[in-house]
């Protein structure tokens, strides 16, 4: 299974949609998490159709910023556990035996609010022990 994350900085842009299609088709990704989609539901559905994914979970943008989407193929057994403006959290049960967690994360771009996003991530990390992949745009430089 291959997972892709991308801060696409406006999925409404034709060039961005075309590039996403090329990447997904070239690497045969199973799950795609996009941040800063900055677009409407109709465009997100259009993108879903051109990359040939059958499922999606959307967190709408707030004003003129943000927006998250998780696309996944029909062959993936994925259940959404929660979402908000900073994350989409899911459980994947690929072969009905080996359950694992997947969190697409978007760190707060506003520096004064970053602790809120990190607190959410800490809360998600405190679940019962099972493998966990957390990926995305953390908007943070780790030294």
Region roles according to the model:
Residues 1-134, 141-142:
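Short phosphate/oxyanion-binding micro-motifs
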């Amino acid at each position: 299974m291959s997972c892709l994350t991308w801060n696409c900085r406006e999925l409404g842009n034709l060039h961005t949609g075309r590039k996403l299609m090329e990447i997904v088709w070239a690497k045969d990704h199973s799950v795609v998490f996009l941040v800063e989609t900055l677009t409407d539901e109709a465009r997100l559905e259009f993108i879903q159709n051109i990359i040939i994914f059958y499922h999606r979970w959307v967190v709408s943008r707030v004003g003129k910023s943000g927006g998250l989407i998780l696309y996944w193929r029909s062959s993936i057994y994925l259940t959404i556990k929660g979402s908000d403006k900073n994350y989409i959290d899911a459980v994947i049960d690929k072969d009905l035996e080996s359950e694992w967690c997947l969190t697409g994360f978007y760190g707060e771009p506003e520096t004064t609010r970053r602790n809120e996003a990190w607190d959410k991530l800490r809360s998600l990390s405190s679940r019962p022990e099972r493998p966990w992949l957390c990926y995305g745009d953390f908007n943070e430089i780790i030294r």
